């Protein structure tokens, strides 16, 4: 299937590892011109080499810290300058923040800033460019709403879900769609750091109908489709990629 992505441009945040890295490679394989950002510039350089080796075009690399207050405006400006325009925005930068109820305000504020505020600010900074050429795709990598404990990032991601739904009412008339992909247990540096192989096997057997953790590429294919012109009628929705982990039916 031709996804009609060749010649499109995309900005992918959190592209240095895991899901963001797989999304960047998936878009590049479809002929998308990339701007990639993350804190670790060395990992972005490695990503660029992998994309070129696979036959893709070297991405524009913009190492930045999404927690920095001025990053959204600077990143939007520099990404548009590098690629000419931004057709696709993938907000993947973020971090899980499990905490106790007594956690200090600064921990909450950091989690909310990274997982909600910066996503909103960057999106709003990119939107005028999308509106100017009457086309855009925004995909937010979020998280589950089915809570199993207190996690500051869950609250932030729930905010993303509500915000994007409202935003579709404002900007979809300009050919822009906004969707979210909440991951399940997807293999990453963080997963390997937090859960042993035994823990992963036990959790998979008990909680994931598919019986295993997912791979970043299995989520990336969904994002690549949502980024395409073919997904123009998919708008304002959440599409979990979790192997059946979520227990709710709708």
Could you describe each region identified by the protein language model?
Residues 137-173, 185-186:
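Catalytic loop of short-chain dehydrogenase/reductase
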Residues 224, 235-250:
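Short C-terminal tail/terminal secondary-structure segment
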Residues 16-17:
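Conserved glycine-rich cofactor-binding loop
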Residues 128, 169-173, 232:
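Alpha-helical segment proximal to the catalytic Tyr-Lys
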Residues 73, 81, 95-110, 149-152, ...:
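Conserved mid-core segment of classical short-chain dehydrogenase/reductases
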Residues 1, 49, 173, 185-208, ...:
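A glycine/serine/threonine-rich, flexible loop-to-helix segment
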Residues 92-97, 142, 244:
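Conserved NAD(P)H cofactor-binding loop of Rossmann-fold oxidoreductase domains
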């Amino acid at each position: 299937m031709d996804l009609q992505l060749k010649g499109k441009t995309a900005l992918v945040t959190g592209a240095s590892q895991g899901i963001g890295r797989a999304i960047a490679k998936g878009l590049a394989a479809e002929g998308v011109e990339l701007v990639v950002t993350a804190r670790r510039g060395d990992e972005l350089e490695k990503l660029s080499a992998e994309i070129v080796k696979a036959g893709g075009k070297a991405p524009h690399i913009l190492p930045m810290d999404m927690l920095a207050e001025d990053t959204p405006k600077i990143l939007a400006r520099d990404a548009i300058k590098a690629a000419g325009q931004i057709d696709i925005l993938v907000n993947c930068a973020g971090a899980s923040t499990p905490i106790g109820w007594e956690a200090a305000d600064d921990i909450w504020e950091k989690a909310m800033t990274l997982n909600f505020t910066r996503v909103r600010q960057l999106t709003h900074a990119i939107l005028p460019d999308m509106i100017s050429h009457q086309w855009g795709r925004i995909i937010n990598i979020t998280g589950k709403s089915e809570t199993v404990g207190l996690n500051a990032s869950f609250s932030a991601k729930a905010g993303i879900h509500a915000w994007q739904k409202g935003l579709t009412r404002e900007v979809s008339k300009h050919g822009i769609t906004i969707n979210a992909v909440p991951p399940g247990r997807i293999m990453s540096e963080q997963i390997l750091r937090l859960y042993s192989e035994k823990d992963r096997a036990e959790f998979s057997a008990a909680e994931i109908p598919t019986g295993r953790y997912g791979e970043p590429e299995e989520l990336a294919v969904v994002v690549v489709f949502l980024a395409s012109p073919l997904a123009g009628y998919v708008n304002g929705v959440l599409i979990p990629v979790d192997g059946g982990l979520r227990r709710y039916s709708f």
